[in-house]
């Protein structure tokens, strides 16, 4: 992470982002199984654009249309994520979600926007710390909630070959079946270990527990574990592959996911 010359702008943006999130009226998990990722605290560098392709498919998932939402088993989900770094502490991500149904049909599934800020290095915190807010729309046939909001604190730390990241995410439905439930707790955690300078292995956990003031019954909660592999193909590349296993009846049983990313640099110079 690069040092920040002025702290007040970062604090102001973080406060504004969090304030907007907490002040927005009464979320179901936003875009389940389209972007399956535990975030690290680092933001994209200024004058850099990160392009990522998230590819996911449920090998064993829902087999029928349920509550008006299309089946997940056999559907191939493709998400294009483009993230632009503006300063050493601020980035904005844009998402386009698509799905290829078993018919086959290629369908647009929605768009999201995600601003994110992070604590600068010269704060000398013992952990990496950042905050993202993601909002967007998805058609009713893909989600019981059409407008959603996600507030994601990100805390991570590297100890030698070990890496841990915790995302205690809060989701909120702005319009749809769950709009009256308030914030719901959807934690994500990653533990990784560097086998070599090129290969890392790890375990990722994703959950959806329900409203923060009244968790769902255990069988209605969603819990997934993904053994994953990350490849360090160079400073411009990102690669992640995993196979996920659902642990409850409400979770897709087997999901395969892959993330492939590349950074485009548009110039160099100090961030302002």
Go through each PLM region and give its residues.
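N-terminal secretory signal peptides that target proteins for export/translocation
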Residues: 1-7
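Short linear motifs centered on Gly/Pro in flexible linkers and helix caps
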Residues: 3, 28-29
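Generic short amphipathic/hydrophobic targeting helices enriched at N-termini
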Residues: 9, 13, 32-34
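Bacterial N-terminal signal peptides
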Residues: 12-25
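Transmembrane beta-barrel domains of Gram-negative outer membranes and organellar outer membranes
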Residues: 29-272
């Amino acid at each position: 992470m690069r040092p920040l010359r002025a702290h007040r702008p970062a604090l102001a943006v973080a406060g504004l982002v969090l304030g907007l999130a907490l002040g927005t009226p009464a979320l179901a998990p936003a875009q389940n199984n389209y972007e399956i990722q535990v975030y690290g605290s680092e933001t994209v560098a200024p004058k850099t654009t990160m392009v990522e392709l998230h590819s996911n498919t449920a090998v064993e998932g829902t087999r029928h249309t349920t509550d008006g939402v299309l089946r997940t088993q056999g559907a191939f989900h493709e998400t294009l994520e483009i993230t632009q770094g503006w300063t050493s502490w601020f980035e904005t991500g844009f998402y386009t979600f698509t799905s290829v149904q078993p018919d086959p049909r290629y369908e647009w599934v929605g768009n999201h926007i995600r601003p994110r800020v992070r604590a600068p290095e010269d704060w000398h915190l013992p952990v990496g710390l950042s905050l993202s807010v993601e909002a967007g729309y998805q058609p009713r046939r893909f989600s019981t909630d059409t407008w959603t909001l996600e507030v994601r604190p990100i805390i991570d730390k590297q100890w030698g070959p070990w890496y841990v990241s915790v995302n205690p995410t809060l989701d909120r439905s702005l319009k749809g079946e769950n709009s009256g439930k308030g914030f719901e707790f959807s934690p994500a955690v990653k533990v990784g270990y560097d086998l070599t300078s090129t290969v890392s292995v790890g375990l990722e956990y994703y959950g959806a527990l329900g409203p923060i003031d009244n968790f769902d019954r255990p069988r209605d909660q969603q819990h997934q574990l993904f053994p994953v592999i990350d490849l360090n193909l160079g400073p411009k590349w990102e690669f992640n592959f995993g196979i996920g296993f659902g642990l409850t009846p409400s979770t897709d049983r087997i999901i395969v996911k892959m993330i492939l990313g590349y950074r485009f640099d548009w110039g160099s110079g100090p961030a302002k």
